[in-house]
Amino acid sequence: MSIVVQSAVTHFRPVMILAGGTGGHIFPGLAVAGVLRARGVPVVWLGAAGKMETHLVPKHGIEIQTIAVSGVRGHGMLALLGAPVRVLPAIFAAMRVLRRYRPRVVVSFGGFAAGPGGIAARLMGLPLIVHEQNRAPGMTNRVLARVARRVLSGFPGSFVAEEVVGNPVRKDIAALPAPGVRFAGRSGPVRLLVLGGSQGARVMNNALPVVLRVLSDSDVAVEVRHQCGEALRAETEGAYAYAGVAARVEPFISDMAAAYSWADLVVCRAGASTLAELCAAGVGSVLIPFPAAVDDHQRRNAEYLVAAGAALLLQQQDRAFYVYLESVLRDLLSNPMRRLAMAEAARGLAKSDAAECIAEIILKESI
């Protein structure tokens, strides 16, 4: 399948990006594609048929080719045993796409199509670059890293041999003033930003209203902005109303730079892109990793920020989760100096030029 936006006919061989399945793979690829295209380098995308990338990538003016492929993890032993039979046709399909476009270099950001696409690239002698966003690498990138020319990572510790370049973030977030400048002279309620992601996080929707109700007996006033996902909006609004806590509940926040700039503290999951944004913005956080994340990668991501003093980590499966959350928020909401120290520590981890750095490496490895 081909969704044509950018012409395949060009004087220059394109860079081919392999990414899909989730926004965590797709958005870093789009950021790097934007840098390459701004330099006049054509980009073509290889994705999986019927997945998120088939709708998202063309909206950014990039041509996408798709192959039929699906994941095998989490589908039982029979799926694993049958993986070679399912993957081989996808590899051959990827090779046909590669022969058509003759890319100068192939870059994997992970996802269903990245495995067959990366293997096909190496079989055809094309340079392969891998970028892993999480500290616990996905199965596809673990395999491809063994044969890749360059292995890049968003966090230290993903691979034994790696180049830590960071995860791409939006330019408006990276351009925010330093925490000390933003926080200077602030008065009034402490500003708490809660991010549940596009699908929402029910544990946050349930816990925050209850905990903030308990904290209302303190001397610290709190202003709450809670992003909960469209499907859970009514439920979240109801939880705050029942708890008697005023909050601005939103299904989606379009201007994340403004939201981070506004916030004194963030409560959120620990996806790689979110943590890269927290660091680029320079804001402290309470991280609640999604416990069902593959290879527990969100917890490992969070531990990197915790070790640097930029965040605190809570596990939602702990029996005393509500008690821990109340204790942590009571301390942080009443301690502006600690919030500032966490924000500055986060900013110290930022790699705001990640997209440009990755693009430079891609161009150096082009044939």
From Swiss-Prot:
It catalyses: di-trans,octa-cis-undecaprenyl diphospho-N-acetyl-alpha-D-muramoyl-L-alanyl-D-glutamyl-meso-2,6-diaminopimeloyl-D-alanyl-D-alanine + UDP-N-acetyl-alpha-D-glucosamine = di-trans,octa-cis-undecaprenyl diphospho-[N-acetyl-alpha-D-glucosaminyl-(1->4)]-N-acetyl-alpha-D-muramoyl-L-alanyl-D-glutamyl-meso-2,6-diaminopimeloyl-D-alanyl-D-alanine + UDP + H(+). It is an enzyme of class 2 (transferase). It is found in: Cell inner membrane. It is a peripheral membrane protein. Keywords: Cell cycle, Cell division, Cell inner membrane, Cell membrane, Cell shape, Cell wall biogenesis/degradation, Glycosyltransferase, Membrane, Peptidoglycan synthesis, Transferase. Pfam families: Glyco_tran_28_C, Glyco_transf_28. Signal peptide: none annotated. InterPro entries: GlcNAc_MurG, Glyco_trans_28_C, GlycoTrans_28_N. One of its GO terms (cellular component) is plasma membrane. CDD domains: GT28_MurG. UDP-N-acetyl-alpha-D-glucosamine binds at residues 22-24, 134, 170, 198, 253, 298. GO terms for molecular function: UDP-N-acetyl-D-glucosamine:N-acetylmuramoyl-L-alanyl-D-glutamyl-meso-2,6-diaminopimelyl-D-alanyl-D-alanine-diphosphoundecaprenol 4-beta-N-acetylglucosaminlytransferase activity; undecaprenyldiphospho-muramoylpentapeptide beta-N-acetylglucosaminyltransferase activity. Gene3D superfamilies: Glycogen Phosphorylase B. GO terms for biological process: carbohydrate metabolic process; cell division; cell wall organization; lipid glycosylation; peptidoglycan biosynthetic process; regulation of cell shape. Pathway: Cell wall biogenesis; peptidoglycan biosynthesis. Its main location: membrane. Its EC number is 2.4.1.227. Cell wall formation. Catalyzes the transfer of a GlcNAc subunit on undecaprenyl-pyrophosphoryl-MurNAc-pentapeptide (lipid intermediate I) to form undecaprenyl-pyrophosphoryl-MurNAc-(pentapeptide)GlcNAc (lipid intermediate II). Belongs to the glycosyltransferase 28 family. MurG subfamily. This is UDP-N-acetylglucosamine--N-acetylmuramyl-(pentapeptide) pyrophosphoryl-undecaprenol N-acetylglucosamine transferase. The gene is murG.
